[in-house]
């Protein structure tokens, strides 16, 4: 990294740049990376593009919102846990608040025909952001025939196999092939890991506690907490992957909302900047209303 926790940046300036990213981040995580590159690397040089690519690869292996995790990791590198938390709030809180408010204004949106007519041009714009981000990242990582082969392998695998497990499987396979091909010595013994196991304890406590409370107590808020927490720790691939799962549970199984209300919220989040997972705020508010 170009900067680290020992040499923190100005909290105010960094959070201002994060807020600028949140205002221009349309189109899901793939497009978000292009925004991060422009604002945090090209303009402010908080880190290098190679550093960003490494963080993206790491977060792709983890469940949950990948672009949010990437940005929070950058915040942690710049200023430690406090700045990481503030980064997450500045990045996600504005659009989450907007989505919650819109869940209570769905009838008004229908009157003004914003369900479909006002949002039909957002999709093509988002595709443009995604193509630009893919090109910029591709020029940095595809350097020879081997990396080109990995790119084709990943693209073909994820295109034909539509399952959440394919993403970490492709990344693990590519990583193993790269390590096996590498001529570096003792590559497995260079990094000493000392993970904070207390965080794993809290994660397991809430995961198991949510399942138990949901099984023994029939309350909509408990069920919603368990469902959304489970989405966060099981779903790999970002907001686009979790949407079908949410639709099945919230609309078809639990009947917390209508299909039209669900699709309206999905259309709205496509037209707003910020993380795709903010759709969970809309869906949760709609479900809580009953």
Describe the residue ranges of each PLM region.
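Multi-pass membrane proteins that catalyze or facilitate reactions on polyprenyl-/lipid-phosphate substrates
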Residues: 1-62, 73-290
